[in-house]
């Protein structure tokens, strides 16, 4: 039934600005995305999500002091992805006869947390500790197209830049200058390596579920 509704609505939207048909196809796209998210959440592969170990070198400045160090992140697990939900309605438009939609999926009533073991070298310090990093604004941005046959195709999928990351580093107070250095380095790694890994794992899974139910 969804497929038939998509075919009819897509045909009208592609040639008409009738809000009734935009509302209908928006409703069907919302439903399809919700079903894809629900299917992903049922998989034990994604929560917790395992992220490859990561090693890095860093350099930071505190006043006139130049700090150089190394760190190793091990046993990285991401928890909380089962809380993902669609954020608002699909933004639907027609371009050259092709129906396109843009949506956001995110975790807003809870946090996505990364838990891992951290070993770092900073001057004479060579400790091993445990870290929990909370992402308080986890958002995925995605786009899709609906063909005249009612088939949905995922055209883009990306985990957005994290705007708010709170790090809890074992053995360090938030007032400790070393905490500030490590927190800055870790957050930069999340924005690059970890965010890319999340996109790499989630995108094909979402594409598979969305297109399997709407082909």
Curated annotation (Swiss-Prot):
Task: Tell me which positions the record assigns to the signal sequence.
Answer: 1-17
Localization per record? Secreted
The UniProt keyword set, sorted, is: Allergen, Glycoprotein, Secreted, Signal
Tell me which residues are glycosylated: 151
Gene3D superfamilies, per this entry? 3.15.10.50
| GO cellular component labels | extracellular region
Mainly resides where? secreted
* Pfam families in the cross-refs: Grp7_allergen
Report the sequence similarity comment from the record: Belongs to the mite group 7 allergen family.
**What is this protein's record name?**
Mite allergen Der p 7
Species? Dermatophagoides pteronyssinus (European house dust mite)
The gene name on file is DERP7
């Amino acid at each position: 039934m969804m497929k038939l509704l998509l075919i009819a609505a897509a045909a009208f939207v592609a040639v008409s600005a009738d809000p009734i048909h935009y509302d209908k196809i928006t409703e069907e796209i919302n439903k399809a995305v919700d079903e894809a998210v629900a299917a992903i959440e049922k998989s034990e592969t994604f929560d917790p999500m395992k992220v490859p170990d990561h090693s890095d070198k860093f350099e930071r400045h505190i006043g006139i002091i130049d700090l150089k160090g190394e760190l190793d992140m091990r046993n990285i697990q991401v928890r909380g992805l089962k809380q993902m939900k669609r954020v608002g309605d699909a933004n639907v438009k027609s371009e050259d006869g092709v129906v396109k939609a843009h949506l956001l999926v995110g975790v807003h009533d809870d946090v996505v947390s990364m838990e891992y073991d951290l070993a770092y070298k900073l001057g004479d310090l060579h400790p091993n500790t445990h870290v929990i990093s909370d992402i308080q604004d986890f958002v995925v941005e995605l786009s899709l197209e609906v063909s005249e046959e009612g088939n949905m195709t995922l055209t883009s999928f990306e985990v957005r830049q994290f705007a708010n990351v709170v790090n809890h580093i074992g053995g360090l107070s938030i007032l400790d200058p070393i905490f500030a250095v490590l927190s800055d380095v870790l957050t930069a790694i999340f924005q690059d390596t970890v965010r890319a890994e999340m996109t790499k794992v989630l995108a094909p899974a979402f594409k598979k579920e969305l297109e399997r139910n709407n082909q």
